[in-house]
Each structure stands twice: as C-alpha cells, then as structure tokens.
C-alpha cells in the first residue's frame, strides 16, 4: 500500500433540486405512472390516468421568428411533440441531441418569443391561440422514476406549494391545478 495515499475522494455528484416547499395533500396510496422512455422528475404534471405531461426548459432566449430553440437535456422531447407557451403550440420537426451535452436543439417554427428559464409544456395539438396540455393535469409526481422501468407505483401530490425556480412544470399547467401554487 502506498503510504502517501491514505484517503480517496468521491465526487459528490449532481445536486437534486428542491421542488416542493410544502405538501399538504397527496393521493392516498399513490398511483400508477405509465412507463416512460425518459426519466421522470419530482414536480412533473401527471393526469388522472397516469400519463405525464412533458415539460421543456428553455436554455437560451429565442425570438418569435427563430427556427430552433435550445431545450435542457432529459426533457423527453421527440420529433412530433407539440411545444407550447401560453396558448400558442408549435410542432417539433426535428431534434438534435448530439451537438451539446447540456441541451437539445429543437427545430420548430416559433410564433412567440421564449426566454432562458421558461418552462414550456407538451400540448395536444398545434395552435395559434388555443393550445392546451396533451393531458388534463391532476397531480404532480412526488418522486423520481427511472426511464423504461415499467408502470410505477409512485407518490402523487395534489396539493402543494412548489418552487418556481426548480419545478419542472409550466405555469399554464399549474394554472389548471386548483391546489398547486408556484411560489
């Protein structure tokens, strides 16, 4: 044994952001979340049927005439998803996942400006003035779920104060949930 090396250093890893400031209501016994090809994070919106509403975090400002936007990695975005801000939804026509380890470049025809830090949501269909989430939100996911792990029994939150800086859910989706508030 080398006597000069009596210790080792272990990288602490990535910090897990705090999403819930206060939880005051949960679905008794939890509920099933459907199998997902991407990781699911605490605070993501879930329908009554266990379908997750994807959330896309913008990592760089883009004007309303931009042909692409940069979305943080691990959002689950795929070609064909409809990305929405407010009531405007646009279809994703291509996704470049190879350019950066921090973000995906998503090809869209924007008609609304987006800012760094905005959380966009997965809409049911493209629209210039009537976009709505792909599923009606009922709960927030209360725990991490690994990709491709099958249907999972999880904690589902239906009453909480969540942190606006870290919650992976769009304001438009939160507005549809009467007992969830971003603070």
Placement of each model-derived feature along the sequence:
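Surface-exposed, low-hydrophobicity beta-strand/loop segments enriched in small/polar/acidic residues
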Residues: 1-183
């Amino acid at each position: 044994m080398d006597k000069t090396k009596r210790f080792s250093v272990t990288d602490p890893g990535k910090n897990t952001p705090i999403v819930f400031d206060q939880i005051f209501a949960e679905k008794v016994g939890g509920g099933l979340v459907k199998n997902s090809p991407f990781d699911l994070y605490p605070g993501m919106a879930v329908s009554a049927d266990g379908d997750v509403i994807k959330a896309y975090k913008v990592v760089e400002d883009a004007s309303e005439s931009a042909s692409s936007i940069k979305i943080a990695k691990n959002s689950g975005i795929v070609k064909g998803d409809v990305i929405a801000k407010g009531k405007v939804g646009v279809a994703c026509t291509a996704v470049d996942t190879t350019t950066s380890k921090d973000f995906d470049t998503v090809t869209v025809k924007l008609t609304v400006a987006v800012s760094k830090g905005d959380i966009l949501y997965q809409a049911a269909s493209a629209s210039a003035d009537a976009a709505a989430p792909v599923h009606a939100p009922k709960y927030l996911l209360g725990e991490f779920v690994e990709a491709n792990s099958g249907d999972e029994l999880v904690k589902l939150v239906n009453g909480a104060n969540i942190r606006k800086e870290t919650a992976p859910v769009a304001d438009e989706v939160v507005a549809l949930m009467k007992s969830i508030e971003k603070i």
